[in-house]
Amino acid sequence: MVLHLVPRWSASLFRASPRWKKTYSQRASAQLKWLGCPRSVYSPLACRAYSKVSGSPEVMLTPERYPVQRLPFSTVSEEDLAAFECIIPGRVITDPEQLQTCNVDWLRTVRGCSKVLLRPQTSEEVSQILRHCYKRNLAVNPQGGNTGMVGGSVPVFDEVILSTALMNQVISFHDVSGILVCQAGCVLEELSRYVQERDFIMPLDLGAKGSCHIGGNVATNAGGLRFLRYGSLRGTVLGLEVVLADGTILNCLTSLRKDNTGYDLKQMFIGSEGTLGVITAVSIVCPPRPKAVNVAFLGCPGFTEVLQTFRTCKGQLGEILSAFEFMDAECMQLVGQHLHLTNPVQESPFYVLVETSGSSAGHDAEKLTNVLEQVLNSGLVIDGTMATDQRKVQMLWALRERITEALSRDGYVFKYDLSLPVERLYDLVIDLRTRLGPRAKHVVGYGHLGDGNLHLNVTAEAFSQELLGALEPYVYAWTAEQRGSVSAEHGLGFKKKNVLGYSKPPVAVKLMQQLKAMLDPKGILNPYKTLPARA
């Protein structure tokens, strides 16, 4: 059976019937009119207004909501401001309006009260700033695009905010090896555009790519949508330049694919969330840009069918399978309710997004078509749509990428980023719906099925200590029973630092604390984050 391509919609909608439809219906065409903007425009962090509703109440200060005590750091004085002005003239920000954005996380769940924002442009300037802060015992909050989900990128109290926003230069790119060297403040989407013009892609893709910085991505060991194909940043990052707490510049900015000399120091800083040093430059290997990308968006009757569809795709698509995402019906409902996006397929209990990327358009499309025919005819899939045109591919991805934005409009969001055995991935969502009942507006699950990553979200009208108590530590204990991880890709930040023990043994936690004490004896780098306080 041959799937005929149609103009501008590279593959037809297919229905749960004996034969494929050769063209998409007028109904489907009308539904897809919203799919006209670039994928980046729909990034929840490219459009800050989505999460900062005009007239919304001020975010509660973090110490008022969470039981945390300020450590005995110094406070910023006029002399400190003068010293900073000498280091970075004209880039010391004390204006309250400008500071407001940097003191609040984009989810509007935590807020610090820093009185100064520093915007260095070079590693040497970062070094001088940290040297001064170390001498004065001033706590420092490194900040990239402020797109984190766990409160790791904003101050808890009055820490000095050290922004990498002006450290946004590409240092070098090699068009044979695909190795990119750049400053830490480069925005991921801009880097993606830069390397795509040279026929490469970034190994990392996130819904927040319009705002997040590559340095922050590395500092949090971000996973994202291409993890299934290209793996984690621990494998694609070749080298780092890092400024330590006392101002020492550690230059491990190698561009070598192989270097087996001594300890691999960069790995300490990948995922350290700015607690061991400030990443100022990154060397990363970029894969060649695929010649052909196909995306299918499918409706499945149950989670068992989602798993079986994944197994079929993984077995038959092999190396060209680059993403396998899932979302439940409530996710689709919220995307429609709050963002007015239309479901392009028949309503289903679950939805799956399958992406392939390879070097042969005809071969890849044929392989995907054959797989889709198989899952449709076997009843694993109720309905679906497929695209090979780049614009339409971006349109289908918007359904998945904008879930976070839709949730942020539904009220206060309790967010959990969990690694679980794939076969148990959705059980916790079902369990919590029963456990929470009407106390929660919505309990939804979506994420990267290909790597066992569940994004569990619970929405409520407002923050509730009672609801939080029903969720925690229950969610973490449940995850630990499955030998899962309490943080798959978002990091621990401020909100999850005290639950590290659910995923790591005491010996490992103690060793991490000792490493922190060795590299940052005064504890000035991103305090109150990532690690529980030492006893």
UniProtKB/Swiss-Prot annotation:
The entry's (R)-lactate-binding residues are R400, H490
- Required cofactor names: FAD
Please list the residues that bind (R)-2-hydroxyglutarate: R400, T404, K415, N457, H490
What is the protein's name according to its record? D-2-hydroxyglutarate dehydrogenase, mitochondrial
Q: Which family does it belong to?
A: Belongs to the FAD-binding oxidoreductase/transferase type 4 family.
Q: What is its main location?
A: mitochondrion
Q: Which PANTHER family match?
A: D-2-HYDROXYGLUTARATE DEHYDROGENASE, MITOCHONDRIAL
